[in-house]
Regions:
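A glycine- and charged-residue-rich anion-binding loop/surface
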Residues: 1-400
Length: 400
């Protein structure tokens, strides 16, 4: 019925079979159904099956097996009983908008740029098509505009069946020589560029119910491009969500929505300036700590805990080990972790890999590296802080 009377979303039917499936549910077959089974890139209908004894039982999925439409339910039904099948109208509308919209968008890129649709996928919140051409931003926008103009013209959509032997004589957008028997054709009037494609999905009788076609993003994919888009109700849902995010961002920046980009550019410039100042301060701090630690070192070895972040800790270690004979083991806290770095100059006596292994064993840390430099971390706890004090109380040479 979804093919012959697509506008009918409810009917009574007789149960032909109802068998358990491996998902702890049941696959229900009836003598007729308004439910569309998943296929041709379109998601399946969902809805309910009703009988007086069980009430409304959800149909969570619908699929075709050996030419038979099966409805996945959570409860069994008796063979021969009469049930009422009802499709979720909101979902059917949304899915049909996406599928008819996909035909129009694919048609637009074919007419304008000779780009062939080589893939179509409908997910819960977006739809994608894959084209065999990579298109520019301007070409993507031109195709979107062309498709929407077809929607606004309320162009007629005609659905008919032909024998596969007649397909070579039809101006189909896509050819498929593997088809046989009776084939369903969906045609959209577009002047000299009539859209015609084989299809098993649900469609409107005209283009207006698609409402709107909006490209959300596009990216190079294989040798062509992948276009993500939404139509009708789904397009409105995307716009509503993104508009809310835009307004929230604008409010946080104290600007109007159309001023968000410039405001973010100013913020980025400010952040870059602050980062430069921070780098300069960190360099000064590293120099001061390096001079202090160098003076406190014994036999060109130092082990110390520093109240700085790990980036600063690494900079200080690098500064110290600019002295070819120097070796350093430095610790610091970052968030809820205790971190360490071991480093040496090219003639330094410390084996940093061996030192990391010993520190890991003492602190329960994870890390490693080379004989020249190593690093690691562990959770900061009272126990690890006590172990750190013990490490720092011993000569750093003991880590070698």
């Amino acid at each position: 019925m979804y093919l012959t009377v697509p506008e009918m979303l409810e009917c009574t039917a007789r149960v032909v079979s109802c068998t358990p499936n491996k998902n702890d549910g049941y696959d229900l077959e009836t003598d007729r159904t308004p439910f569309f089974p998943e296929g041709g890139g379109q998601l399946s209908d969902i809805g309910t099956v009703y009988d007086p004894m069980q009430g409304f039982v959800p149909v969570t999925h619908c699929f075709e097996a050996n030419g038979t439409v099966l409805h996945r339910t959570g409860k069994p039904f008796a063979v021969g009983e009469i049930v009422t099948l009802k499709v979720d109208a909101a979902k059917r509308l949304k899915y049909t908008q996406q599928h008819t919209g996909e035909h129009l968008l694919s048609h637009a890129y074919d007419v304008l740029f000779g780009a062939e649709n080589v893939g179509f996928h409908m997910a819960g919140d977006v739809v994608t098509i894959d084209l065999d051409h990579d298109l520019s931003d301007e070409e993507i926008e031109a195709g979107e505009k062309y498709a929407n103009e077809l929607v606004w013209k309320n162009a007629p959509v005609r659905i008919f069946n032909v024998d596969a032997s007649e397909l070579p004589n039809l101006p189909l957008r896509k050819k498929n020589e593997k088809l046989h028997g009776e084939v369903r054709i969906v045609e959209v009037e577009d002047g000299d560029h009539t859209e015609m494609c084989t299809c098993c999905g649900t469609h409107f009788m005209s283009t207006a119910p698609v409402g709107l076609i909006k490209v959300l993003e596009h990216a190079r994919y294989k040798s062509g491009c992948r276009i993500t888009f939404a139509c009708g109700v789904l397009a409105l849902e995307h716009f509503t969500k993104e508009n809310a995010e835009l307004r929230r961002t604008a409010a946080a920046l104290s600007v109007k929505p159309d001023g968000v980009f410039d405001a973010l550019a100013r913020k980025e410039e400010q952040v870059q300036g602050l980062n430069q100042k921070l780098r300069e301060k960190n360099a000064q701090l590293a120099k001061l700590y390096s001079e202090k630690l160098h003076a406190e070192a014994q036999e060109n070895f130092i082990a110390a805990y520093l109240p700085v972040d790990f980036d600063a800790c690494k900079t200080i270690a690098e500064t110290l080990c600019a002295d070819d004979n120097f070796s350093a083991v430095l610790f610091c806290n970052e968030s809820d972790r205790l971190r360490y770095i071991c480093a040496r100059g090219k003639n330094g006596a410390l084996d940093c890999r061996a030192a990391a292994q010993k520190i890991n064993a003492l602190l329960g840390a994870k890390g490693g590296g080379s004989p020249v430099t190593s690093q690691g971390s562990c959770p900061k706890t009272a126990e690890t802080e006590q172990k750190l004090r013990e490490i720092l109380s011993e000569p750093v040479q003991n880590l070698n």
